[in-house]
């Protein structure tokens, strides 16, 4: 009886399995079955529609944050519990996310404890302060979005500011942020902000840092590595809490890359002054849920227009950018990079229209090279070693405008700046005034050196009585000595004073 019941259950289970399996088409064989399996595997790498934040991910799957293309990537878990490398293209960089079980996560971590001590420096000011940033000079040129940088700014808030112009809104754009948050290294003596530079890689490590007012959640240890070839690596050693649970009320919380360009415009309030406007032209945002203990992210740079050094290679490039050659600047660009101010000032957008490289070679109008001293970032810059950061307010007139295609960008087509004409009479007047001042100075020097000359006696005899008498006396140990006589009082002697 038991054997019959067991056989009946087995038949029922087999029938249910057949009912749940997909229908097998006519002519199906084992070869087609393997091909169907391979097709399903390939489909696992295709783009899928964006999932809303309210959706719950299915077990065995993970999700990468959206890129600028507006989609997401979903990956499956392999049978050996290893995770496929999550790869995404962000136009300027290809990002790869390695989970805690990946060997690459350990290989990409730079252990400063075993590194050459002469190359490791602990920044004492940043390690004992909150909301501070300090400028550091690299030993090599680091290409960031195609721009070679030699100076960066390390901030206590878990990010590196990559801009040239320091301002109070460093958290807004132009950053390399492994984990930007309200960290306070000054809370604990064990918290340090250190950096390492061996000529091929520059590493910044935030070691055992605590969140402001959330110290009970534990310490964070992570690093950002800038490689000489342009690669950027984020390594996470200790992440005691979910990044999504970190409050952004007092400080932005984000991870990724960002760059922007600066435009100088005349201020509508004060026509004589200029307003600096920052336009963010690209950003890479990482999914905060992927930032866990012993995880890593690697950004590999993609070719940009700026790398082309000739007109032929520029116009024949197969990049996703619309590269154009500006002969007057001798530069290849899409028009949207840190040199956009020059691109607009010299009319490069109009120059490239309808012209070929042969036209540039024969055109003598563009034979003169531009002034090499011109920089789109001319202006007052902060040179102090530390800078207070306040992402909520700003002391200057710098604004942040997220760039949208064709919105809000001024188009300066004229390469020349207009100003009031300088008349010849003004120049002559200035020259005469300079000559008059020079003559007075020379006369004074002569009189001081020859007090008994006719000229000196002439001025002394005709000076008003209420003027103080100025007498000059040479002393071997001091440069100049003066004697000042108050009006109405005559006295002998002099007062010595060393000229500073």
UniProtKB/Swiss-Prot annotation:
Subcellular location: Cell membrane; Cell junction, Tight junction; Secreted
Membrane topology field: Single-pass type I membrane protein
Keywords assigned by UniProt, alphabetized: Cell junction, Cell membrane, Glycoprotein, Membrane, Proteoglycan, Secreted, Signal, Tight junction, Transmembrane, Transmembrane helix
Pfam families the record matches: PSI
Signal sequence range: 1-19
Region (Disordered): 22-72, 360-379, 399-420, 481-500
Biased composition (Polar residues): 366-379
Sequence ranges on the Extracellular membrane side: 20-426
Main location: membrane
CC per GO annotation: bicellular tight junction; cytoplasm; dendrite; extracellular region; neuronal cell body; plasma membrane; receptor complex
Tissue and organ expression note: Detected in brain. Highly expressed in Purkinje cells of the cerebellum.
Residue ranges annotated as Cytoplasmic topological domain: 448-500
Transmembrane segments: 427-447
Positions annotated as glycosylated: 34, 81, 116, 190, 198, 318, 322
GO BP terms: spinal cord development
Protein family according to the UniProt entry: Belongs to the plexin family.
Subunit structure, as described in the record: Interacts with NID1. May interact with CTTN.
Stated role: Plays a critical role in endothelial cell capillary morphogenesis.
Protein's name in the database: Plexin domain-containing protein 1
Organism from which the protein derives: Mus musculus
């Amino acid at each position: 009886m038991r054997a019959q019941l067991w056989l009946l259950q087995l038949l029922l289970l087999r029938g249910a399995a057949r009912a749940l399996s997909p229908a097998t088409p006519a002519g199906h064989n084992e070869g087609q079955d393997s091909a169907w399996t391979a097709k399903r595997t390939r489909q696992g790498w295709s783009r899928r529609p964006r999932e809303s934040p309210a959706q719950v991910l299915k077990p065995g799957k993970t999700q990468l944050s959206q890129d600028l293309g507006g989609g997401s990537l979903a990956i499956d878990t392999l049978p050996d519990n290893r995770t496929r490398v999550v790869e995404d293209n962000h136009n300027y960089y290809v990002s790869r996310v390695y989970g805690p079980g990946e060997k690459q996560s350990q290989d990409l971590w730079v252990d400063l404890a075993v590194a050459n001590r002469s190359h490791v420096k602990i920044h004492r000011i940043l390690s004992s302060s909150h909301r501070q940033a300090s400028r550091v000079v690299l030993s090599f040129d680091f290409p960031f979005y195609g721009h070679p940088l030699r100076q960066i700014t390390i901030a206590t808030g878990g990010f590196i500011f990559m801009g040239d112009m320091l301002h109070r809104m460093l958290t807004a754009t132009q950053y390399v942020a492994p984990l930007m948050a309200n960290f306070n290294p000054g809370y604990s003596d064990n918290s340090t902000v250190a950096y390492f530079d061996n000529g091929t890689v520059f590493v910044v490590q935030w070691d055992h840092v605590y969140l402001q007012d959330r110290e009970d959640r534990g310490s964070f240890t992570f690093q950002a590595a800038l490689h000489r070839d342009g690669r950027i690596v984020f390594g996470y050693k200790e992440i005691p809490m979910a990044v999504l649970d970190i409050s952004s009320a007092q400080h932005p919380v984000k991870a990724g890359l960002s760059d922007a360009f600066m435009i100088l415009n005349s201020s509508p309030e004060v026509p004589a002054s200029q307003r600096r406007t920052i336009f963010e032209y690209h950003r890479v945002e990482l999914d905060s849920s992927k930032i866990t203990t012993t995880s890593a992210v690697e950004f590999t740079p993609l070719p940009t227009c700026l790398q082309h050094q000739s007109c032929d290679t520029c116009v024949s490039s197969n990049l996703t950018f619309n590269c154009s050659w500006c002969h007057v600047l001798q530069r290849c660009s899409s028009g949207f990079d840190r040199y956009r101010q020059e691109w607009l000032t010299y009319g490069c957008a109009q120059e490239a229209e309808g012209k070929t490289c042969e036209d540039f070679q024969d055109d003598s109008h563009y034979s003169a090279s531009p002034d090499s001293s011109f920089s789109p970032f001319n202006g007052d810059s902060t040179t102090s070693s530390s800078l207070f950061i306040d992402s909520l307010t700003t002391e200057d007139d710098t604004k942040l405008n997220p760039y949208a295609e064709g919105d809000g960008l001024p188009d300066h087509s004229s390469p020349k700046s207009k100003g009031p004409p300088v008349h010849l009479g003004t120049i002559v007047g200035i020259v005469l005034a300079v000559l008059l001042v020079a003559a007075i100075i020379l006369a004074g020097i002569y009189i001081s050196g020859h007090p008994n000359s006719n000229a000196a006696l002439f001025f002394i005899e005709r000076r008003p009585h209420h003027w103080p008498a100025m007498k000059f006396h040479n002393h071997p140990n001091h440069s100049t000595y003066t004697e000042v006589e108050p009006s109405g009082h005559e006295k002998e002697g002099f007062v010595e004073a060393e000229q500073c």
